[in-house]
Amino acid sequence: MVFDMHKLQKLSVLALKLNSKIVSAESCTAGLLSASLTEIPGSSAFFEQGYITYSNNSKTSVLGVENKTLKKYGAVSEQVAKQMAKGALKRSNSTIAISITGIAGPGGSDYKPEGLVCFAVTKINGKTRTETMEYGPIGRSKVRS
């Protein structure tokens, strides 16, 4: 798989230790995070489900991302990543949600270039942490991984 399996293994150990279940909400990665998590033996003990919400319409209809947030900040923003994570958590029996939205390329703009990826992690009754990474024009496959 494409994600750093060592880091995902550490995440799985932590989730098991906390008796937590993980849900993912993915846009630009189109399910690669979910696929990578389920490569870990015993993943059914910590991974519940994943949502692939590639279009803006699916972000609103499936995860409850607000149209006004999409219009104001764009699909690739920490604000949308946060709403994706919170929406996934609300619609699942999980206690931890991870979301990813970005511009895999080609394309982008000066304001939101190719390789821009926004992440959010939230837990039930907890804070949401967001982060934006700029990987640059390294190609779709590398941005998505």
Regions found by a protein language model. Give the residues of each.
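Short alpha-helical segments enriched in small residues
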Residues: 1-145
